[in-house]
């Protein structure tokens, strides 16, 4: 693909960075727009969004390193190398980092927690979809070798250098699969957002939809550092995906059940 969009002398613009940045800006714009419809202060929404992005990047990078700790423990100098910085990260780690930051900020500024999460969930899905196209361009987060007609073949040595991407071999386009999933999730979440019956409904739907999709996508991922757990039964990301589905299901059940209780019964 095209890991580097163009060169000017020694300077180059990484395609991954451009698309991820675009995804972040688009996601933030949608999140702030949704927040204003929920009566949330736009300044608080913007500040929260910036904090979430920064902590999400840190969380994604930390889990990327943890998942490939056998390599990084033997080469600690590579943790802060330019190669590692360009290699992307693990989205579930970013989701955890962003969530921790969001919980802190929302509590500190007394924002309506579930309503805020509902406002941000669709933007997160769309931003992630755009970012995954950047992964395809960079060659990271690639899939297993395949004979299917939709297989993608990487030939740029930069992809191999940064992400160990196999060259000249048709691979499952896991980046495009996940981008399509997240685009569909965005459409579904916006539909729910406009019709939601209780705060937390959009967040719960996102956790369930993304958790299920990511669990199964892990079976065809083949990039190194998958972070296997329980003796290789599943990857760390699959474990996090299961936790997301359970959490989403609990939020939906608890909030919808509370809404169904007659007002006099809640006194």
Where are these regions (language model features)?
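A feature for loop-to-transmembrane-helix boundaries and adjacent hydrophobic helices
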Residues: 1-267
């Amino acid at each position: 693909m095209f890991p580097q969009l163009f060169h000017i002398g020694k300077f180059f613009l990484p395609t991954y960075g451009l698309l991820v940045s675009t995804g972040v800006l688009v996601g933030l714009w949608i999140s702030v727009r949704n927040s204003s419809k929920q009566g949330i202060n736009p300044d608080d929404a913007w500040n929260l969004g910036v904090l979430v992005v920064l902590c999400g990047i840190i969380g994604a990078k930390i889990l990327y390193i943890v998942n490939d700790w056998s390599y990084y423990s033997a080469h600690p100098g590579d943790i802060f190398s330019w190669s590692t910085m360009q290699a992307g990260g693990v989205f579930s780690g970013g989701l955890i980092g962003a969530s921790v930051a969001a919980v802190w900020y929302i509590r500190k500024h007394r924002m309506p927690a579930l309503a805020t999460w509902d406002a941000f969930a669709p933007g997160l899905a769309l931003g992630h979809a755009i970012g995954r196209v950047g992964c395809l361009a960079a060659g990271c987060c690639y899939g297993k070798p395949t004979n299917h007609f939709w297989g993608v073949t990487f030939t740029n040595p930069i992809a191999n250098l940064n992400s160990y991407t196999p060259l000249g071999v048709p691979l499952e386009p896991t980046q495009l699969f996940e981008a399509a999933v997240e685009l569909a999730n965005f459409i579904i979440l916006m539909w729910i957002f406009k019709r939601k019956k209780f705060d937390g409904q959009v967040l719960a739907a996102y956790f369930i939809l993304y958790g299920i999709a990511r669990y199964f996508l892990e079976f065809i991922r083949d990039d190194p550092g998958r972070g296997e757990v329980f003796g290789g039964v599943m990857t760390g990301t699959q474990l996090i995906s299961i936790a997301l589905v359970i959490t989403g299901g609990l939020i939906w059940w608890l909030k919808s059940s509370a809404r169904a209780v007659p007002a006099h019964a809640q006194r």
